[in-house]
Structures are given as structure tokens and as C-alpha cells.
């Protein structure tokens, strides 16, 4: 890349930094005063004219400065050399807060709340996907001789509790045999495979336990084939309203803040944005129209996968106006995802 291109990028970087900080269009005079660009005001004006002609910046009003476009933000993000690191104290605080979660639900809720606070954006996390989870343990508890409580625990921390009404009563010995049959069919299997295994138990069960096995298997299959990946935890929605000015005046897109809020209520839209993020350790940035969601034209989505022991369990990230602190937000998303995975791996 030529020195001219490098200089023009520095001008673009300065425009992005000032606009993110002030929310005001940026002029050449302000750039020269605030940044050590090492060139004259005339050169900066010429560079800004070039950036505008190439679509990296735009003039929102006749007599104002310039603001970055989606293309400009993309160029800026693609050339971020160093993501702003979190301090040791911040990393320790994140881990301590997440480790205090009592179960999967609590850890994910804490993660979303934390990410929303760190980034001042809307944070979202997807529950562990069905295909990624395995059965860690099945507990069978007799509530009465004719009623059982099944507690299914996955390696991702998901816990499901279901009641089984029996046709016949079971004594302690029969209960232990049933527990062994069900546990043997399920333990360690991915949920899809576990569903098949438990559905085949009826043909193999001893005659005196067949009714209890069939009833238990029916409940378990229903549990195993549900889709927890359709569940989302959302936090920080109020941050959108605090940034309401960023969603006004988007050409051809009136009422955009309302449209974004409505899109957030449609979980399928958010799930679509997280669907391509099933890679822990890699942060994806979608800016404006790159989201390919009409209601999200004025937003950016920064997302990644989280997981444990090399397995990606789900996606998570933040959503906010395109005018955001990209280096800081990328660092926060990566850190919270990494520590959620670490906490889940230890359980």
C-alpha cells in the first residue's frame, strides 16, 4: 500500500474516532487540530474529498463536516491492527462475575448483562445448540411409587426436569433397574443420538419394566428433540434508546429505531445473525447492510461463538448503531465469550 493510501487511511481513522466520540460531523480544521497527521489542512481537505468520492465518508448536511459510511467503517475495521485489550483487573472481574453463576441460565444471564454494560450496546447470547450438546447424566427420582422425576443434565450445563406418570408402581429395586437402563442408553451421547437410543429401549426392556420404560422414553424423546438453540437471552435494550439520535435521518429508512426494536422481538432475525458465528475465537463484524436484514440497516452486529473443550455451544454478540467503538467492542465480545466457555468447561 502506498504512502498516499496510508495517509488517507489515517485521515479516515481520525474521522471515525472523532465521530464515534462526538457524534458530530467532522471537518478538516478539527482533524488538523486534534490529530497529529503531519500534513497541511489543504492536504487533509484533498484526502477527505478523495475519501468522499470513493464512498468512505459522506456529507450529511450542506454546510457540515463528514461522517463515515458503512464502507468507511468496513475499511476501518478491516485495518484494525490492535484490538484494544482489556486490563488484568477487567478480565479478573469478568471471570469472577461469571463464576458466581449458579447454573447455565445464570451464567448466560450474567454474561449478557456484563457485555451490555461493557459495550453500552444490546447484548445477546444463544442457548447451547441441540447438535452440540451431549448427555452428561440422567437422574431418576421416585416422587411417589407411581410418579417419577427425570432430571436430564447435558455437558453444556442445560438441565431439564420432567414428570413421568407410571401405570404401575415401582419398588426400589425396579427403580434402580430402570435408572440403569435409561442411563446406559443416554450417558455420553449427543442429544440426537440419545433420542434414537432411548426410543429403541422399549424393544429391549424386560417385560415387567416395559411399561415404565415406554412411558419414560416417550417423555425423554420429547425433551431431547426440543430445540434450545431457539432460546435467546437479551440484555441492554435500553442502550438503543440512549443512542436514538443514531437512528434518525437514515436515508430512506424512517422510524429505524422502532424497526430495530421490532426485529429484536423476532428471535428468528437475531438467530439468523448469530447462525454464521459458530466459531469460537473468531469475531465477526457485520456493518449496516452487511447484516442483510432490512430493519438492521442502521446497525452493526459484532458476534462470535462460545464453547467448551473445543466444542462451540452457541453464538453471542452485541448489536448497536454503526457509530460504535469497534476496537473496544470486539475485545469485550471476545473476552466475555472466552470466559463463558471457560466457566462452562469447569462444570
Swiss-Prot record:
Keywords: Repressor, Stress response, Transcription, Transcription regulation
Cross-referenced Pfam families: HrcA
InterPro entries linked: GAF-like_dom_sf, HrcA, HrcA_C, WH-like_DNA-bd_sf, WH_DNA-bd_sf, WHTH_transcript_rep_HrcA_IDD
A biological process from GO: negative regulation of DNA-templated transcription
The keyword Membrane is annotated on this UniProt entry: no
Gene Ontology terms, MF aspect: DNA binding
Keyword Transcription regulation included in the entry's annotation: yes
Protein purpose: Negative regulator of class I heat shock genes (grpE-dnaK-dnaJ and groELS operons). Prevents heat-shock induction of these operons.
Family: Belongs to the HrcA family.
Identification of the protein by name: Heat-inducible transcription repressor HrcA
Organismal lineage: Bacteria, Bacillati, Actinomycetota, Actinomycetes, Mycobacteriales
Gene name of this polypeptide: hrcA
